[in-house]
A protein has these predicted regions:
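Juxtamembrane/disordered regions of integral membrane proteins
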Residues: 1-167
Length: 167
């Protein structure tokens, strides 16, 4: 297994895992909103909010993080033989925290900068609070999807390694 192959496998599995995470987030939001508004309105919840650009930027950042951190995970799991469950969990946590941190700056720039010097604390409101809540609600999904991601990365690495040796 070369480093390039390990990174490619990790990147692909990272992007698949991020896609799964985004689908789960969409499903959760649909369920929460559809209880009051109906399924169609719940499914298209993002069309009725003022911060859709923040969601879009967050999704793009999350995909980039999935690619970048996935490469790191591929190297750690397939080359260095780290524990795939722990590595997957830590990488999953890194993806959601990095995404939250950078996506939060969108709201800070849009609204928070105007509140600097007032009684409001824009850094706390736009950076710290999202980090806190994503950590609280994202810990268990990061563990589950991260472990699944680590297992798939390890499995794909074994499949790739086995086909190269003629097994």
């Amino acid at each position: 297994m070369t480093l390039t192959e390990a990174k490619r496998i990790g990147s692909r599995q990272g992007l698949i895992s991020v896609g799964l995470g985004l689908l789960i987030a969409q499903f959760i939001m649909t369920l929460m909103i559809s209880t009051d508004e109906g399924f169609v309105k719940g499914f298209f919840w993002f069309t009725d909010i003022d911060y859709w650009i923040n969601i879009l930027i967050g999704a793009i950042i999350m995909l980039a993080c999935g690619h970048f951190y996935g490469q790191i995970a591929g190297k750690l799991i397939l080359i260095r033989k780290w524990n795939f469950v722990l590595t997957g969990f830590l990488i999953g946590l890194a993806v959601i925290l990095t995404t939250t941190f950078f996506a939060s700056w969108t709201g800070f720039i849009q609204e928070g900068i105007d509140n600097i010097g007032t009684n409001d604390d824009p850094f706390f409101d736009y950076i710290f609070k999202p980090m806190y809540w994503v950590t609280m609600f994202g810990l268990i999904p990061a563990l589950i999807i991260g472990a699944w991601f680590g297992g798939r990365t390890k499995k794909k690495g074994k499949e790739k390694h086995g086909t190269q040796q003629g097994v």
